[in-house]
Amino acid sequence: MQPQPPKTTNVPTPARHHAGKTLATLAFALALPHTTAALAQQATPQPQQDTPYQAAHKGGTLRLVASTSGGTLDPQINYSGKYINLFAVVYDGLTTFKKVQGPEGNSVVPDLAENLPTPQDGGLTYIFTLRQGIRFSNGQPVTTADVSASLRRIFKVGSPTAGSFYSAIVGADLCLKTPATCTLKGGVEENPAQRTITIHLVRPDTEFLQKLAFTHAVIVPANTPEHDVGNTPIPSTGPYRLTKYDPNTTLSLDRNPFFKEWSAIAQPQGYPDTIEYSFGIPDEAAVTAVENGQYDFMADVIPMDRLGELGNRYTAQTHVRPHAAMYFLPMNVNIPPFNNVKARQAVNYAVSRKAMVIFYGGPGIARPLCGMVPSSLPAATNFCFYTKGASPTASALQWQAPDLAKARQLVQESGTAGQKVTLITANTSVDMAMGGWVRDMLQNIGYQASIRPISNTLSMTYVQNTANKVQISLTTWSADYPSPSNFLDDLLGCENFHPNSDSSINIPGFCNKQVQSLMDKAKTDTTLTPTQTEDLWRQADRLVMAQSPIAPLIERDTVVLTSARLGNFFYTTVNQLFFSQVWVR
């Protein structure tokens, strides 16, 4: 899951890189590990027991702040964590993730459907029964026609996950080829009299219910325009509705007047009366504003140089929570210099994952990552090819130190030494600090390297589009739901590479038949035990890292800063701070 900028061709002028500032920042950061470790220990209590709704805390305005907006309001297109987590209190799908704290939040539960169906026909057929009496925020009843239209709309609007999540539906192949004429004929059948929706698959999908729980499969009215609605809100089913949006300044939500709670674990009634999201406040200023109570929550990553202050003075307002997320360097395997595997391996050897940990805030909230699967997920990476003394044929158990000599040797062997390389980063404090270090590293191993910071609002779609000829970039990714497929298949699956598109999350343009075969078997073979499935993902992980289309850097926890007045801090494993359940009065 990544920031989804508004579509635009206006890219800021590259900023000048100052190596001295990078070194000074790293020197400062060396003092942080003990502080952040203490912060993690102090600020991470055990999840609270979920309690019945407490009407005394109903009301008030929840005030959120971010440096930039998150792009389109279209829930079937937006792929930013910033808005996906917000949309969780606005929209609903047939299924959802359980709205409880702790590991149980990874469980799928029925949402607009009455119950979870048992797959039939060897995992090829799912029959859902729609709940009665649910209305959209415009008063319109939710019908089976809305469900069918919403599933077709995933393909018609070019949802970023249309291919990776929903291509198993019968008829999806034609929809992916010609979205405008998508019908999903034979794939989606409705029976209005029985309130049932039947979905047929061409192959089993062991994670299909999880994919239906993801935001891109939410149910919207059948007459919703079949294109990106941009800044125009779509009627919704959840406890809140989107009311006003200016991407430069504000996003406003208020209560959905037609919402009546049907399941507290699927979509609980909310506490705040309104939610106000303010944009244009830089991350440094946002920290101060939340500390002072001007806002209740900041969406941006907390700058490294403020973590010590939070650990010393604001521990009650600072919350460290696990989240399957990583920083990484995708390298374009189709253009020089990284169309050479040795050049890509050189980057993996040369990068100091310890430095990246420090730039993010220290070992209390981040850890080196050698492969594609963070430690909180099944089939977590358990090897390290690219550390001093190791190789793809003689792996280590964990990362120890960079090997610059090996990296320089590989650059020379690749014949790419001296080539110009431009690193694209977002212009946030953390990304700029990391990016500055990576630029210096690229220079050190033999390239003419420069850094090009781009607005955080634009960077993610920019690096996805092959027309921009991005060689290497620094970006982040977090799980849409708890599965290794979210990192291996999403980021490197052949079906997720779409040249000349802003929606091509396979940024390296990597496609390997052997890797894809392993991933497809892990996703579709319902006869496998969990252990056997994990083994397939681990095999894919090792094959991927031997080819090095990506240099994983760190896995990171989430550090959440809230105001002193915010009560009932409610964190779910999938949607993080769950906005409807916090108290502001």
What residues fall within each predicted segment?
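Long beta-strand-rich cores associated with HINT superfamily self-processing modules
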Residues: 560-585
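Extracytoplasmic/peripheral linker and loop segments enriched in polar/acidic and small residues
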Residues: 48-50, 55, 188-190, 357-360, ...
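Alpha-helical secondary-structure segments
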Residues: 63, 143-152, 194-200, 204, ...
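Gly/Pro-rich hinge or "lid" segments in bacterial periplasmic/extracellular proteins
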Residues: 98-103, 184, 200, 204-270, ...
